[in-house]
Amino acid sequence: MKLTPREKDKLLIFTAALLAERRRARGLKLNYPEAVAFITAALMEAARDGKTVAEVMHYGTTLLTRDDVMEGVPEMIPDIQVEATFPDGTKLVTVHHPIP
């Protein structure tokens, strides 16, 4: 299977997000890379599902709370940017303060 660098990045994000999802389901608090992967993958899937950019941006702030992550992680993630594929093309989505 031949994948472009972008496709490889998407698979890496998905794999890290899957691990984060499983750890969260077991009651573990997510660390920085897990939290970023979890939110990023959810944003990409929401875009793929046909939500608008504004809906995806708002959705990104509802995925995790301070109780879901290790101490200090929310401050380490002032914003998340991801190029997501929407039905009308690829767009850059920025979520400010994704963990309120």
From Swiss-Prot:
Residue spans crossing the bilayer: none
Highest taxon of source: Bacteria
Predominant cellular place of this UniProt entry's protein: cytoplasm
Annotated GO MF terms: nickel cation binding; urease activity
Subcellular compartments: Cytoplasm
Enzyme class: hydrolase
A single cellular component GO annotation: cytoplasm
One Pfam short name: Urease_gamma
GO biological processes: urea catabolic process
Record's protein name: Urease subunit gamma
Source species taxonomy: Bacteria, Pseudomonadati, Pseudomonadota, Betaproteobacteria, Burkholderiales
Gene it is expressed from: ureA
